[in-house]
Amino acid sequence: MAENWQKVNTDPVCFGARDDTYGALSITKTGRVKTMKLVHRSGSIHCNPNDVDSYWSCTHSGVGNKLMTIITNTNKDALLPPTGDLETNPGNGKKYFYSLKGTGHKSPELVFRTLSNPLSLSRNQELQIWYGQDWVDVSEGNNSGQVCVDVFAWYI
């Protein structure tokens, strides 16, 4: 079966690591989407000045291979990954971690899992791409950097 990825951004979408610097994305096509993926274009993010670069997460030893890049609606409700996939950080009780088999903090693509209930998206609908700590306003004071991505949706 042929892959059915369609690019849904015109210019790269950039998001930061602190101070509500989400990346805003205006959807280019109405339809039902079974998943989305982000393709790294440029930049990196740090959750600590002493840790190495990451595209999707934090390389601090306490995080391991967990990911922290989240797509939300304008109400900041998690769409991808779905809220039920998010894990709680035991240090602060906030949910913003998740795992995707085969995807690490410097993978060139972040492909979210296929949804059992596809998303219904409308042309010109705004979605937001967040760095997890910034999304839940926790431990972001020493975060830095910005990542720019292309966004693809799998329409059904």
Q: What is the predicted role of each segment?
A:
Residues M1-I156:
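Acidic, Ser/Thr/Pro
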